[in-house]
Amino acid sequence: MRKFWLLFAQATTIGLAVLFIINTLKPGLLSSATRNGIVTLHESVNTSTSQIPTAGFSAAARKVMPAVVNIFTSTEIKKPMNPFMDDPRFRFFFGEEFDSSPQRGSNLGSGVIISHDGYILTNHHVIEAADQIEVALADGRKAKGRIIGSDPESDLAVIKIDLPGTIPAITFSRPDQAQVGDIVLAIGNPFGVGQTVTMGIVSAVKRNHLGLNTFENFIQTDAAINPGNSGGALVDVNGNLIGINSAIYSPNGGSLGIGFAIPVSTAKKIMEQIIQSGSVTRGWVGVAVQEITPELAESFKLGNIQGVLISEVVRGSPADKAGVHAGDILTMVDNKQLLTDSSSMLETISSLSPGKVVVFKLLRNQREVGIQVQVGKRPRPKKLE
């Protein structure tokens, strides 16, 4: 009996050893039925782990850098007159320390050459109030820039330079080509140190409600963007323009990996209007709207109806003349369903041509009303003094 148990123990030991070796070296030989409770994972058969160019991004950078410029602006700053400067005795004791003669302030930014005849796209805030503009190209050439026009509500502007010889120009990507996760390069002149290329990814698209501009549809990126990068290029790995770097989120002024660029689809529309007429024309009806919250929907007994609540009507505006009232629910414009946010309403109305007559479909006192509204021209924003 003792011999039997000895043989059994030896056989069991050998069997377990064989199973251990097979499971270690050839786990696929074991039937999945012997591993109850273990989830089978499917590994990718694709051997390619990245679409990053084997030579890095130097080709894309070389393609783009000649078309990205440094912009230096200066503005005359008038100091308030000191009331004591007219007194000779005051000037005798204090000299010209309180001189109120004009001084000059300077600013810097970046821009993108969009055509071989010298048109440059940049941010409105880069050239705002500038009375002198100098543009420095990557090849060392410099030229005076003149403002063709600007659009404060999208923070875009176009300037022009005149130079002998060839002027490089950037290539545009197809509109709305950028996708979350795409690798991008940002090119500009951060802090005035000179042309700089940084790399990151597209973190998000269609960012709005940031309070930066009236019209917002930003590409968000973690590519380093710093003061001086404004107006520079955001490009894909092929060196095609996908956006104009415009702003960063930063409590201390440095890059925290949250930058915003105006997409090329928006930039092209604004740019073309500015080049043609020197300004941007948008539709306007004179209403303020707010989004309909679940509480408002219940209060107005809207059910599944989508739209925006008209909270204010400007007196004398096209909407006022047509009979639109505060408290109306706007659901459609010319039979086009509105999204449920104020940004979509703003985009819809601003895209209409002034003078066009459109039909507003309204819900008033739980009854559907159709009103014809003649679209007006959106007023330019007032400058802050």
Predicted regions and their residues:
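Serine-dependent protease modules
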Residues: 2-306, 311-315, 322, 333-336, ...
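Conserved catalytic motifs of ABC-family nucleotide-binding domains
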Residues: 327
